[in-house]
Amino acid sequence: MSERLDDLNDRREAALHAGSERAVKRQHDKGKMLARERIDYFLDDGSFHELDMLVRHRAHESGIEERPYTDGVITGWGTVDGRKVFVFSQDFTVFGGALGEVFAEKLHKVMDLATSVGAPMIGLNDGAGARIQEGVVSLDGYGGIFWRNVQASGVIPQISVILGPCAGGAVYSPAMTDFIFMVREKSHMFITGPDVVRTVTGEEVTLEELGGAGSHATKSGVASFVCDDERQVLDEVKVLLSYLPSNNLESAPVVAPQDDANRSCPELNDLMPDSPNLPYDMRTVIEVVLDNGEFLEYHDSWAQNIVCGYGRLNGRSVGVVGNQPMRFAGVLDMMASEKAARFVRTCDAFNIPLITFVDVPGFLPGVDQEHGGIIRHGAKLLYAYCEATVPRIQVITRKAYGGAYVVMDSKSVGSDLSLAWPSAELAVMGPQGAVEILHRRELEQSADPAARREELVDEYMEKFANPYVAAERGYVDDVIDPADTRIRLIAGLEMLATKHEELPRRKHGNVPL
């Protein structure tokens, strides 16, 4: 037995150092951690249990003579803050982290386990794509991964962390997960690289411009979160996990409250500008209301006219959506609608209550928006709210105009509780536009159109642009003192804690994609 144990230990040692010294040095010289170093940093100390440590490729006819253990990816399970998670970490020092048949089988196994056990699946991506030498077998492996991403969708949280290159077909697995994290100047995602783009289209573009973290954080909306280095990004994943349940049958962890549930927020009374046309920062409202001012913002650099993210109220996770008057007056456009729709559906999938702060003057007008599909994109957000069965509370802080008001989780689309500040303006449209339509002839015949227009705007504001007409009809459940917003939200969530709602039986809804 002693000899057999020695042999086992030798094999394990070889697996622990599967990459060559040269490849390891090259990885470190780039300022990047090794696959095992990432797992060790991310998981609780001593909690990692590895799967398939001793597997090797069997592509004997592919011309690959080396057969290192692990085959370029580390898989297994462990804990983060005491909670079970499954993880894979691509090893760029072995075959460049490229995916072959055995590599894919390892991912299939760990993904199946995560889904059946009901624990989050975390993918640490740093690889060169498909292993060309293994041909179509690699493509079949990717297909199995994509299929499993879809089977796990809405069942367990799936988080992709891009720590190096992720190109070609390899990008589609992260794209189907719930969240994508990237590192500035280290992470790159694209279907076709700069050389192919140059050859096919003649466009000159750098790697960073085409598929860097900055581009995906600000332009494409692919990156949910972006950090400065690997350790920071892994720490941020841990923070996100703290807001999420392990699966769709559980609730998110409850944290012992460190903030008074009965805390008043008097600063909110002084936040709103006197002029309805002046902006204020919706993030301030959100952070003042949440426990300890802690707010993990989702897509903070993309579609900034709407704010989405996670926080807690009295120790319980909530998803927060809010129009941002600081950007384009908080209008809804194509990107904002898509961003918020994705966020709302993710919260609903994982039993996280939704708080929606409304200050929306409407949908962004323009030929580009219409031709780009604002009708279809706006419908995504409307669909997401109508479909959501989690507790939903709406808070109208100022403007709530037209169809955009309805879309932003109004009572008519199923919000459980609608609260309004005294500054709220619920109307079909803004006063200027309404006056132009309702009184066009009168203004044309007026001796002083400007003065008469101002009078009519004031009349409209007094009669319609307030929360009380809606409150009289029950479209708003209560008009509240802004200072009481936190107190009222916590009370509302406690009341809704036992809410149970089921959608009609169907194969699946037809989201306007």
What is the meaning of each model-derived region?
Residues 1-513:
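Ligand-binding clefts of soluble mixed alpha/beta catalytic domains
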